[in-house]
Design a protein with these regions (language model features):
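Short, polar/charged alpha-helical segment
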Residues: 77-84, 101-121, 216, 220, ...
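Glycine-centered hinge/linker elements that transmit conformational signals in sensory
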Residues: 247-256, 290-356, 406
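Bacterial signal peptide processing site
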Residues: 19-22
């Protein structure tokens, strides 16, 4: 996802930061993880580095899954590695990321800590995500990186892999970067590396922060006996967490049209946004089509057809087309259904202002207390929605709401991607001064190290390490986070994934989505026409990439065929269902949590 921050969204960021600070003071330290196998003793007493390291360990880097001695040992490794780079004249580096709470914590706190402990100054710029992508594109085109390190969405993995401008970390850690790689890095502890791995099996990015897109609902309203009785009388099944889009639609209609008001204020059964704006594209590329069931079966992304509707060769290397006529699914019946439901629900069940809102403007609305459920909700809003005094928070600080897996459309099948997960990841250019890259790699490892990662997770609620997720500190926080900890502890989380490797040039293709979706919102185009146009434009871009060539695996479009003959019930593009609204299905929230613990996606 690409976040754009309006004034409203900036308030969300501030609230996230404030809530994170509150959490830090309540979570106890833990020492459950194994010590990093770093060479050398803990930092020797008396040195400036020792004083700085001890200060930060005692005052800031708590809780941690490491003991204080283990933290000191890990920091000693960073001090020694940095000393070798300083001897080569490296005293300062520049890195960049988007503006979310986690990265603000890195820029304002961890960069300062890194400088005090290692002596290398870090200029960690915070800019809008759209600007990160634009600057990244410019650097890729010129061949000169304007930063020593980048935190870039793993959505660009297919782009990075194919252009050959981004460093392959697997080979770097085994070769030129071996002496700069923390022995305690513990890659297996990272939960998102499958999302940053290319078709060649090599790691191209190191995860720095993650958040998922889930279903959000007012558990307190869903538990009201009068509403449960009223819903069952009308629909014939229990009011609960919707398992399919039919139930979501029924619940949306129920709250908007039947309940109408709660405590004298209007209540709506749905919330969304529809303004013609780049954020409208992310509303779809962040896996909306996969939730409907547009793609093929496959984790992390459908194979051979992914959630953008792009078909790739059997080895996942060569994109072959987005339109149904080329074997893709961007304008398939399932994709058209997904767009149709998005438009219909927003116009029928959301506040009337929703169609004119951007992502940043719509994000804070559920916290105001007049939304009963939202099918497309980012866990990055968790902390903002747990502030005391909000209409959606109890007096004891526990939320009145919960998060759950998003319901699935009628085309969805077991084994498909279930939803989206954002994975902001450290990215480095190949043709960049080696010592500058090494220093930036040190900083990247520092801000993701076990010494600091649990505190960072509590601050921004964007976990990257299994050891942090399983810590006592997160257990203690869980009751106030509305299901976030339970989700990330579930083996089922692997079905929430970022954009995959089928997408050959994310920036060029992503910009096509919002312009076409917007025309379906305004009614200038039917959903079918909008998706037909989008699919054709995607094929045109991939044809240009094919002609221009790419370092690895450029697109090679399939010849056009008869779309009707491409549709099948064996795989994507799926043929149109006779009934796109089966009976609604719901589940009790506690039963759902039990399924999560068992590793079931549903």
């Amino acid at each position: 996802m690409k976040l754009q921050y309006t004034a409203l969204a900036a308030a969300v960021v501030l609230a996230l930061a404030a809530c994170g600070k509150k959490a830090e003071t309540t979570a106890p330290a833990t020492g459950t993880a194994a010590a990093p196998a770093a060479s050398g003793p803990a930092v020797a007493a008396g040195s400036a580095a020792d004083v700085a390291a001890k200060k930060w360990i005692d005052s800031e880097f708590t809780p941690s899954t490491l003991s204080k001695d283990q933290q000191a040992t890990e920091l000693k490794w960073f001090v020694d590695a940095a000393a070798k780079l300083k001897a080569k004249g490296i005293t300062e580096i520049a890195v960049v990321s988007e503006t979310i709470t986690t990265h603000e914590y890195e820029s304002k706190t961890l960069a300062k800590a890194f400088e005090e402990i290692t002596g290398i100054k870090v200029k960690h710029d915070l800019i809008q995500e759209g600007d990160v992508v634009e600057k990244l594109q410019t650097s890729m085109q010129s061949g000169k990186s304007i930063y020593d390190g980048w935190i870039s969405d793993s959505d660009l993995i297919g782009t990075h892999y194919r252009y050959g401008k981004v460093m392959n970390l697997t080979d770097y850690m085994a070769g030129a970067g071996k002496e700069w790689t923390n022995p305690g890095l513990d890659l297996k502890d990272f939960i998102g590396t499958s999302f940053t791995t290319g078709p060649d099996g090599k790691l191209y990015q190191l995860p720095d922060q993650q958040f998922a897109n889930l279903y959000w609902f007012r558990a307190d309203l869903f538990a009201r006996e009068d509403l449960k009785t009223q819903f069952k009388a009308k629909y014939g099944y229990d009011l609960g967490v919707p398992l399919n889009w039919s139930a979501y639609e029924d619940i949306a209609a129920f709250f908007t049209n039947d309940v109408k008001q709660i405590e004298g204020k209007p209540i709506y059964g749905h919330m969304d946004y529809g303004k013609k704006d780049p954020s409208l594209g992310w509303r779809f590329t962040d896996a909306w089509l996969s939730m409907a069931g547009t793609a093929d079966i496959g984790i992390p992304n459908g194979k051979p057809v992914d959630e953008w509707g792009i078909r790739a060769s059997a080895d996942g290397c060569t994109p072959q087309g987005a339109s149904v006529s080329r074997g893709g699914a961007t304008n398939s019946p399932a994709a058209v259904y997904a767009l149709t439901k998005y438009v219909d629900w927003m116009k029928k069940y959301a506040p009337k202002e929703a169609t004119g809102m951007t992502f940043g403007e719509a994000g804070p609305v559920p916290a105001q207390g007049q939304i009963a459920q939202q099918i497309f909700w980012y866990t990055a809003f968790t902390a903002d929605m747990t502030k005391k005094g909000l209409p959606v928070v109890n007096e004891d600080g526990t939320p009145k709401w919960r998060m759950a897996p998003g319901p699935n459309g009628p085309y969805w099948k077991q084994g498909m991607q279930n939803g989206y997960q954002d994975v902001g990841s450290w990215t480095f250019f190949t043709d960049h001064p080696a010592d500058k890259t090494a220093a930036a790699w040190l900083y990247a490892q520092f801000v993701t190290s076990k010494t600091v990662s649990l505190k960072k997770t509590i601050t921004g609620l964007t976990p990257i390490r299994e050891s942090d997720i399983q810590s006592q500190a997160m257990t203690d926080l869980a009751p106030k986070l509305g299901g976030l900890v339970e989700f990330y502890r579930s083996p089922a989380r692997v079905a929430w994934t970022p954009t995959g490797t089928n997408v050959p040039d994310y920036p060029k293709l992503a910009q096509l989505w919002w312009k076409n979706v917007a025309q379906a919102v305004t009614g200038e185009m039917t959903p079918q026409k909008a998706m037909d146009t989008l699919a054709e434009e995607m094929d045109d871009v991939m044809a240009r990439l094919e002609r221009a060539g790419m370092a690895k695996c450029p697109p090679k479009l399939n010849p056009k065929g008869d779309p009707a003959k491409m549709l099948t019930d064996k795989g994507a593009p799926w043929k149109k269902l006779a009934n796109e609204k089966p009976k609604g299905e719901t589940i009790a929230y506690q039963t759902l949590l039990d399924a999560w613990k068992a590793g079931k996606v549903r």
